[in-house]
Amino acid sequence: MKLNPSKCVFGVTAGKFLGFMVSQRGIEVNSEKVRAILELEPLRTVKAMQSLNGKVAALNRFVSKATNKCLPFFQVLKKSFEWTDECQKAFEDLKKYLSSPPLLSPSMPEEELYLYIAVLQAAVSAALVRDEGSLQRPVYFISRAF
């Protein structure tokens, strides 16, 4: 195996890995990906809506009940595109949530994990968490629409 020295980093406590910020504290969302969503204006075209959905999909593991939060966006794509008040509220709520996204905690081998499942009318969501003292820290979020 050959390593490219200019691409190698040794002895660091944090860094970008596969698009995420990894540190001793856990896995953080890449701030550039969040900024791309936070700086968006209300969407005017189907293409812009598809772009937003792609950006949110890249951050799904950090967003609790992501499908439920983004359901108005999916519904607009199925019909003729119209930015509704419901879309605007969902967009603002998503921006508010992403302004302070959770830190995902790494799990340890043989550690006991807990899975919380929420079944809603149009989506199912799950949160994988671990105990850290008296707190429960998120490990991973997942959600799907019906």
Question: Language-model segments: which ranges?
Answer:
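C-terminal reverse transcriptase regions that engage the nucleic-acid substrate
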Residues: M1, P5-E112
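Secondary-structure transition/capping motifs at alpha-helix termini
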Residues: M1-L3, V129-R137
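Eukaryotic short linear interaction motifs
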Residues: F17, A123-V124, L135
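Conserved beta-strand elements of beta-rich interaction domains across eukaryotes
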Residues: V34, F81, L120-A122, F146
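A short beta-strand motif that forms part of the nucleic acid-binding face
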Residues: P42, R130-E132, A145
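Two-metal-ion RNase H-like nuclease active-site motif
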Residues: E111-L120
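Acidic, metal-ligating active-site segments
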Residues: L120-R130
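A short, polar/acidic, helix/strand-boundary loop motif
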Residues: S134-F146
